[in-house]
C-alpha cells in the first residue's frame, strides 16, 4: 500500500434481531456504539423495538494501513437509560481487522451477540457490513499570492503593529469560529439525545502559537460530520466496565485484556522473541565492495574468506559490488583469525584460440576474532568500513566490509550464507509456507429443458427410456448426479424436462479454477448431450443459510452440428460459512470459516521454540562409507507451515528457531515433524531425491497451562516395514499465552465448527471425500512452492493414510475401548463385592447410605457433585506438570505388532503382494469379521426380545407380562415408594446365605423370549 493513500473503514449497522427485553415491558430501545482504533461512533436510538433497523453508515479513519489487520472493531449494543432502569447492556461483537472486506465485496453478516460476563443475559444477533475504501489524498492547494497593495501595506508597517494586527485578526477569526460552533451545537441539541456525562469536544489548538509573517484569511466553517465521535468518560474505558479483567502473567508484554490482544501480534513483539531457544553465536562478515588503485573494471573480482580450514568466496563480478553476508557458526571455528583477500580473474587467449583464466591476489587484510565487536538486536547494523589490502605487487587496493559477532536473531541471518546449512542452497533454508484458502463450492442441479437428444427412429424403438445424469467438473474433481429416466415420447418430441434437485459439493482453492464445467450425458448411448462453462468469477458467495443463491439458466452447447442442445437450471455459490477440513478432525489445528467476515479475533498466541535434536540415527550414506543425517523440522498449525533450516551431516543438530501463531481455539493440535533432507542434492540424472520421515509429535493446546513454558524432549518413533524404530529425540519449547480468561471460557462453550456445519451438515461419507480432496489440493499447492515442500512431507503431516486398514491401529482402538470399559468393570466388581458381602463393614455402610438416600432424596445430587468436586480437587496434585503428552508408542501398539501386519499396513491400493500372502491376510480378516458378526447378532437379539414382548410374538410370555404389570400397578399404588426402594435395595444386597446360585426369575424370563436369529439364513 502506498503511503499517500488514505483508507477509511465503513461500518454499516443494518439491523438486529431477537434482542433481550430490558425495559421491564418486553421491549428495548437499542443503539449501537462502535469503537475502532481510538475512534467512537454512535447510531440513533430505536425506541421499543426488539428487531431494530438502523441502516446507518459510520466512517472511521485508518491511521496505519499496514496494521489494520491487527486492530479490533468492537460494537456494543446498549439500551437507552431513559426507557428503563435495568442493565443497559444488550451484547457486544468483536471483529478482527483481517475480516474487513474491500469495497464492492462486502456482504451482510449477522453476528451473534456475545456476553460481557458469564452472568450476562444476552441473546440475539446484529447484522452489519464492514469494508474499507482507499482514497487518494486531495492535492495541496497552491499558495495564493497576496495582492500588491496588501503586501505593500504589510511591508510599510512596523513589526510591532503588524504583529498586533495579525493577533487581532486571529482572535476575531477564533471568536467567529466559536460562535458558529456554538450556533451549530444549539441547532443539533434538540435533535440528538446527548448524555449528561459526555464531555465537550476538545478545543481547537491555540492559533496564537503560530505567527505567520503574512496575513491569514479566516478559516472556513467546519465541515458537517454525520456521525460525530462520542466523547468517552473515564469510567467507560475502564476494563471492568466492559466485563474484562486483565490477568498478570509472567512476561511483561503479555499483561492486558482481550482489548489489548493486537499488541501480542505486533511485529515488534514477534521479531524480538527468542526467549524459548538458546542464543547461538555466529561470526558475521558483510563484504560490500572493493576499490582498485588502477581503475580496471573489465576483469571480474571476487573476495575470499578463510578462517582456519573454513573457506568461502563471494560470487565473481565485474562491478566489484558484492554486498554478501556470511555467517559462520562460532563453535565450529578452529582459528582465531580471519583473513579476507580479494582476487582478480583475467582471461588470456592463447595462440591455439584456447582461453585460460589466471587469478591474481590484489591484497589481504586480517582480523583478530577476539577483538571483533558484538552486536545484539535491536542495535543498529554495523556500518561497513574501508580496509586497505596489504600487497606487495598491487598496493593501494581497498575493500569495504564489516565484521561482528551476533546470534541467529540478527536481521542479516536469514539472507546470509550459513556455514551449518550448506551456504546458499535454497532447499536448506528456513521458510514459511501458507496453505491455500479453501472454499466449498455448492452446485445445485435443478432441472433441464429443451434437451435435443437426437435419437433416430430405430433407436427409439430399441431404447424405450433414456437415462440421463449431470456431470460437473472443477479441475480434477468430477461429481455426478443420480440417474433419471425420461420416456421415448418425451425424448422424441424434445419436451423432456428431467428434474434432479441434487447438490454437488466441490473443494475450491484460491486462486480459483477458471471454469466449472457442467455436462449432461446420456447413459444409454454413452454420449454427451451438451455442456456449459460457468465462470468462477461470476459465482456469488454466501456466509450463512439465511440467503439462498439465485438460480440461473445456462445454455447447453453440443458439437459443431448442434450449437444449442437445451438449457440447464442450476444454483452455484461459494459457501463461506463452512470450514474446509484438510486434516483429520481429531487433530485439527484450525476451525475458522472460509469467509473472513465471520472470523473472530485471536484469543491468544502460540510460541514454539525448535531447539534441537539428539541421538539421531543415520538414514542414508555419504560417499558410500559412512552414515549421515541432514535433519530439518516442519511445524504446522492452522494454515501456516514453517520449515527450519537443514543442518547438514549432524546427528545432534541445533536449530534454535522460534515461531509464533495466532490461536483462535484452544482445543486444537500443533503438529511437528522431523525429516531428512534428500532434495538439496540431485542424482546423476538430475532428479531430486525424497525426504525421509524421522518422526512426528503432536501437542494439544488444551493440555497446556497458559503463559507457561514447557521445555521437553520427545522421542521420535517411526513405523517401518521392518517394525517400529526409535530415531532419536527432539527438544521443543512451547508456550501458550492468553491474556483473557473470559475468551478461553467463551471458546469452551461455543461449538467447535462454524454454524453452517450444524444447520446444513454434510454427510459423513461426503465430508470424508471432501477432506481427502482438500488434502490433495494442499499437497499439490505446497509442492509448487519454491523451494517446494515435498509431497511426502505434507502427506505425513496431514495423516492422509489414517483411513487405510491397519491391524495395528485396530488393536490400538480396541485396547482404548477396553481401557474405557475397564473402569465400568471395576465399578461392577465393586458392586458385586458389596452384594456378596466380601467386606461386611462396607456393605453395612452401603445399607446406611441407602437409607439416607431414600429418606433424604434431596441430598442425592448435592452429594454426588460434592463428591466429584473433592475427587477432582485431590487429583489436581497428580496431573502432568512437566511432561506434555505426545505420540505414545505403547498406546499405538508399535511394540506388539507382527511383521506381516506391518507389511499389510504399508501395502497400497491395489495390493502388490503375492496371491498366497493376500489369501492368508484375507482368511485372518474373515476370522476377525466372524467374531464381530457374532457380537452384532447377540446385540440385535437383545433388542428383538424386547420388541417380541410387546408384539405378542410369544402369546404366553406376553400374557404373563401383562398380568405382572397389572399386579405391579396395584402393588406400587398401595406400597409407598420409599418403602419399595428400601425393600428393593436390601433385597439386592442381601446376605449370601439368602441367595441362590441359579439365575434370577427376570433373567430366565427374558432369555426365553424369541428373537429374529432363527429367521436368518
UniProtKB/Swiss-Prot annotation:
<dbReference type="GO" id="GO:0031982">
    <property type="term" value="C:vesicle"/>
</dbReference>
<feature type="binding site">
    <location>
        <position position="355"/>
    </location>
    <ligand>
        <name>Ca(2+) 1</name>
    </ligand>
</feature>
<feature type="binding site">
    <location>
        <position position="352"/>
    </location>
    <ligand>
        <name>Ca(2+) 2</name>
    </ligand>
</feature>
<feature type="binding site">
    <location>
        <position position="355"/>
    </location>
    <ligand>
        <name>Ca(2+) 2</name>
    </ligand>
</feature>
<keyword id="KW-0333">Golgi apparatus</keyword>
<keyword id="KW-0812">Transmembrane</keyword>
<keyword id="KW-0677">Repeat</keyword>
<feature type="transmembrane region" description="Helical">
    <location>
        <begin position="851"/>
        <end position="871"/>
    </location>
</feature>
<dbReference type="InterPro" id="IPR000008">
    <property type="entry name" value="C2_dom"/>
</dbReference>
<protein>
    <recommendedName>
        <fullName>Multiple C2 domain and transmembrane region protein 14</fullName>
    </recommendedName>
</protein>
<dbReference type="Pfam" id="PF00168">
    <property type="entry name" value="C2"/>
</dbReference>
<feature type="domain" description="C2 3">
    <location>
        <begin position="420"/>
        <end position="554"/>
    </location>
</feature>
<feature type="binding site">
    <location>
        <position position="352"/>
    </location>
    <ligand>
        <name>Ca(2+) 1</name>
    </ligand>
</feature>
<feature type="transmembrane region" description="Helical">
    <location>
        <begin position="957"/>
        <end position="977"/>
    </location>
</feature>
<dbReference type="InterPro" id="IPR047257">
    <property type="entry name" value="C2B_MCTP_PRT_plant"/>
</dbReference>
<dbReference type="Pfam" id="PF08372">
    <property type="entry name" value="PRT_C"/>
</dbReference>
<feature type="binding site">
    <location>
        <position position="299"/>
    </location>
    <ligand>
        <name>Ca(2+) 1</name>
    </ligand>
</feature>
<feature type="binding site">
    <location>
        <position position="359"/>
    </location>
    <ligand>
        <name>Ca(2+) 2</name>
    </ligand>
</feature>
<keyword id="KW-0106">Calcium</keyword>
<comment type="function">
    <text>May function as a signaling molecule by regulating the trafficking of other regulators.</text>
</comment>
<dbReference type="InterPro" id="IPR047258">
    <property type="entry name" value="C2C_MCTP_PRT_plant"/>
</dbReference>
<feature type="binding site">
    <location>
        <position position="296"/>
    </location>
    <ligand>
        <name>Ca(2+) 1</name>
    </ligand>
</feature>
<keyword id="KW-0479">Metal-binding</keyword>
<feature type="binding site">
    <location>
        <position position="296"/>
    </location>
    <ligand>
        <name>Ca(2+) 2</name>
    </ligand>
</feature>
<dbReference type="InterPro" id="IPR047259">
    <property type="entry name" value="QUIRKY-like"/>
</dbReference>
<dbReference type="InterPro" id="IPR047255">
    <property type="entry name" value="C2D_MCTP_PRT_plant"/>
</dbReference>
<dbReference type="InterPro" id="IPR035892">
    <property type="entry name" value="C2_domain_sf"/>
</dbReference>
<dbReference type="GO" id="GO:0046872">
    <property type="term" value="F:metal ion binding"/>
</dbReference>
<feature type="compositionally biased region" description="Pro residues">
    <location>
        <begin position="217"/>
        <end position="231"/>
    </location>
</feature>
<comment type="similarity">
    <text>Belongs to the MCTP family.</text>
</comment>
<keyword id="KW-1133">Transmembrane helix</keyword>
<feature type="compositionally biased region" description="Low complexity">
    <location>
        <begin position="141"/>
        <end position="153"/>
    </location>
</feature>
<feature type="domain" description="C2 2">
    <location>
        <begin position="258"/>
        <end position="387"/>
    </location>
</feature>
<dbReference type="GO" id="GO:0000139">
    <property type="term" value="C:Golgi membrane"/>
</dbReference>
<feature type="domain" description="C2 4">
    <location>
        <begin position="587"/>
        <end position="714"/>
    </location>
</feature>
<feature type="compositionally biased region" description="Basic and acidic residues">
    <location>
        <begin position="154"/>
        <end position="213"/>
    </location>
</feature>
<feature type="domain" description="C2 1">
    <location>
        <begin position="1"/>
        <end position="110"/>
    </location>
</feature>
<dbReference type="InterPro" id="IPR013583">
    <property type="entry name" value="MCTP_C"/>
</dbReference>
<keyword id="KW-0472">Membrane</keyword>
<feature type="region of interest" description="Disordered">
    <location>
        <begin position="139"/>
        <end position="231"/>
    </location>
</feature>
Amino acid at each position: 500500500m502506498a503511503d499517500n493513500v488514505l483508507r477509511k473503514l465503513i461500518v454499516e449497522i443494518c439491523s438486529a434481531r431477537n434482542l433481550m427485553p430490558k425495559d421491564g415491558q418486553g421491549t428495548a430501545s437499542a443503539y449501537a456504539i462502535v469503537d475502532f482504533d481510538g475512534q467512537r461512533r454512535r447510531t440513533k436510538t430505536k425506541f421499543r423495538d426488539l428487531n431494530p433497523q438502523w441502516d446507518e453508515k459510520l466512517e472511521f479513519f485508518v491511521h496505519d494501513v499496514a496494521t489494520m489487520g491487527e486492530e479490533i472493531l468492537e460494537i456494543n449494543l446498549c439500551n437507552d437509560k431513559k426507557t428503563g432502569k435495568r442493565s443497559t447492556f444488550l451484547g457486544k461483537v468483536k471483529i478482527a481487522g483481517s475480516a474487513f472486506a474491500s469495497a464492492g465485496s462486502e456482504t451482510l453478516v449477522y453476528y451473534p451477540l456475545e456476553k460481557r460476563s458469564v452472568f450476562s443475559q444476552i441473546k440475539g444477533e446484529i447484522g452489519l457490513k464492514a469494508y474499507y475504501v482507499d482514497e487518494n489524498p486531495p492535492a495541496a492547494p497552491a499558495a495564493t499570492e497576496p495582492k500588491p497593495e496588501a503586501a505593500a501595506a504589510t511591508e510599510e508597517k512596523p513589526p510591532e503593529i503588524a504583529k498586533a494586527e495579525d493577533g487581532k485578526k486571529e482572535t476575531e477569526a477564533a471568536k467567529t469560529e466559536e460562535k458558529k460552533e456554538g450556533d451549530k451545537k444549539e441547532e443539533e441539541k434538540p435533535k440528538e439525545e446527548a448524555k449528561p456525562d459526555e464531555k465537550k469536544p476538545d478545543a481547537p489548538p491555540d492559533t496564537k502559537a503560530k505567527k505567520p509573517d503574512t496575513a491569514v484569511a479566516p478559516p472556513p466553517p467546519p465541515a458537517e460530520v454525520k456521525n460525530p465521535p462520542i466523547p468517552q468518560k473515564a469510567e467507560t474505558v475502564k476494563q471492568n466496565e466492559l466485563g474484562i479483567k486483565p490477568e498478570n502473567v509472567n512476561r511483561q508484554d503479555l499483561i492486558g485484556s482481550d482489548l489489548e490482544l493486537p499488541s501480542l501480534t505486533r511485529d515488534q513483539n514477534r521479531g524480538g522473541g527468542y526467549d524459548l531457544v538458546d542464543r547461538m553465536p555466529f561470526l558475521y562478515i558483510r563484504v560490500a565492495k572493493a576499490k582498485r588503485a588502477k581503475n580496471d573494471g573489465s576483469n571480474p573480482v571476487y573476495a575470499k574468506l578463510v578462517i582456519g580450514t573454513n573457506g568461502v568466496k563471494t560470487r565473481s563480478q565485474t562491478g566489484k559490488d558484492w554486498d554478501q553476508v556470511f555467517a559462520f557458526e562460532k563453535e565450529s571455528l578452529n582459528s582465531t583469525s580471519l583473513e579476507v583477500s580479494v582476487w582478480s580473474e583475467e582471461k588470456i587467449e592463447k595462440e591455439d584460440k584456447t582461453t585460460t583464466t589466471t587469478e591474481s591476489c590484489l591484497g589481504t587484510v586480517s582480523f583478530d576474532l577476539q577483538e571483533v565487536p558484538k552486536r545484539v538486536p535491536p542495535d543498529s547494523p554495523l556500518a561497513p568500513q574501508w580496509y586497505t589490502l596489504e600487497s606487495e605487487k598491487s598496493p593501494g587496493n581497498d575493500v569495504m566490509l564489516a565484521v561482528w559477532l551476533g546470534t541467529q536473531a540478527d536481521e542479516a541471518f536469514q539472507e546470509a550464507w550459513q556455514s551449518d546449512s550448506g551456504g546458499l542452497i535454497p532447499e536448506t533454508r528456513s521458510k514459511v509456507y501458507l496453505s491455500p484458502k479453501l472454499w466449498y463450492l455448492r452446485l445445485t442441479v435443478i432441472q433441464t429443458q429443451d434437451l435435443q437428444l437426437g435419437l433416430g427412429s430405430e433407436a427409439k424403438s430399441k431404447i424405450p427410456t433414456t437415462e440421463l445424469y449431470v456431470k460437473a467438473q472443477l479441475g480434477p474433481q468430477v461429481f455426478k448426479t443420480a440417474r433419471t429416466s425420461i420416456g421415448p415420447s418425451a425424448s422424441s418430441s424434445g419436451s423432456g424436462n428431467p428434474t434432479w434437485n441434487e447438490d454437488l459439493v466441490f473443494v475450491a482453492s484460491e486462486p480459483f479454477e477458471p471454469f466449472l464445467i457442467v455436462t449432461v450425458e446420456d447413459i444409454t448411448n454413452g454420449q454427451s448431450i451438451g455442456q456449459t462453462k460457468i465462470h468462477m468469477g461470476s459465482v456469488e458467495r454466501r456466509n450463512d443459510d439465511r440467503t439462498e443463491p439465485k438460480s440461473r439458466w445456462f445454455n447447453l452447447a453440443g458439437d459443431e452440428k448442434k450449437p444449442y442442445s437445451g438449457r440447464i437450471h442450476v444454483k452455484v455459490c461459494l459457501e463461506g460459512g463452512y470450514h474446509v477440513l484438510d486434516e483429520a478432525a481429531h487433530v485439527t489445528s484450525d476451525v475458522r470459516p472460509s469467509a473472513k467476515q465471520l472470523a473472530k479475533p485471536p484469543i491468544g498466541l502460540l510460541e514454539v521454540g525448535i531447539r534441537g535434536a539428539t541421538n539421531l540415527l543415520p538414514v542414508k550414506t555419504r560417499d558410500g562409507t559412512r552414515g549421515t543425517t541432514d535433519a530439518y523440522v516442519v511445524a504446522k498449525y492452522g494454515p501456516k507451515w514453517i520449515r527450519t533450516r537443514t543442518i547438514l551431516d549432524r546427528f545432534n543438530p541445533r536449530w534454535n528457531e522460534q515461531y509464533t501463531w495466532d490461536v483462535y481455539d484452544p482445543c486444537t493440535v500443533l503438529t511437528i515433524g522431523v525429516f531428512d533432507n534428500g532434495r538439496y542434492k540431485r542424482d546423476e540424472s538430475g532428479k531430486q531425491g525424497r525426504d525421509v520421515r524421522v518422526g512426528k509429535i503432536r501437542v494439544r493446546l488444551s493440555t497446556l497451562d497458559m503463559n507457561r513454558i514447557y521445555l521437553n524432549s520427545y522421542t521420535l518413533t517411526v513405523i517401518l516395514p521392518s517394525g517400529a524404530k526409535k530415531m532419536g529425540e527432539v527438544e521443543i519449547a512451547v508456550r501458550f499465552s492468553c491474556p483473557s480468561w473470559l475468551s478461553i471460557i467463551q471458546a469452551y462453550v461455543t461449538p467447535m465448527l462454524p454454524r453452517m456445519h450444524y444447520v446444513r451438515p454434510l454427510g459423513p461419507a461426503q465430508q470424508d471425500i471432501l477432506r481427502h480432496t482438500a488434502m490433495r489440493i494442499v499437497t499439490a499447492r505446497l509442492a509448487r512452492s519454491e523451494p517446494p515442500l515435498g509431497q511426502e512431507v505434507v502427506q505425513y503431516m496431514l495423516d492422509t493414510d489414517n483411513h487405510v486398514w491397519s491391524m495395528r491401529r485396530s488393536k490400538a482402538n480396541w485396547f482404548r475401548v477396553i481401557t474405557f470399559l475397564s473402569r465400568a468393570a471395576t465399578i461392577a466388581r465393586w458392586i458385586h463385592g458389596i452384594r456378596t458381602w466380601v467386606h461386611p463393614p462396607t456393605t453395612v455402610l452401603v445399607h446406611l447410605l441407602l437409607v439416607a438416600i431414600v429418606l433424604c432424596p434431596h441430598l442425592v445430587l448435592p452429594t454426588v457433585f460434592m463428591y466429584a468436586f473433592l475427587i477432582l480437587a485431590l487429583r489436581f496434585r497428580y496431573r502432568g506438570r512437566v511432561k506434555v503428552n505426545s505420540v505414545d508408542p505403547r498406546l499405538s501398539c508399535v511394540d506388539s505388532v507382527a511383521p506381516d501386519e506391518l507389511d499389510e499396513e504399508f501395502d497400497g491400493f491395489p495390493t502388490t503382494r503375492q496371491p498366497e500372502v493376500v489369501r492368508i491376510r484375507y482368511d485372518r480378516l474373515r476370522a476377525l469379521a466372524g467374531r464381530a458378526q457374532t457380537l452384532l447378532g447377540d446385540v440385535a437379539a437383545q433388542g428383538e426380545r424386547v420388541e417380541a414382548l410387546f408384539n405378542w410374538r410369544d402369546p404366553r410370555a406376553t400374557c404373563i407380562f401383562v398380568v405382572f404389570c397389572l399386579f405391579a400397578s396395584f402393588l406400587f399404588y398401595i406400597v409407598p415408594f420409599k418403602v419399595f426402594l428400601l425393600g428393593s435395595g436390601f433385597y439386592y444386597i442381601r446376605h449370601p446365605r439368602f441367595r441362590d446360585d441359579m439365575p434370577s426369575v427376570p433373567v430366565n424370563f427374558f432369555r426365553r423370549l424369541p428373537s429374529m436369529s432363527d429367521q436368518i439364513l
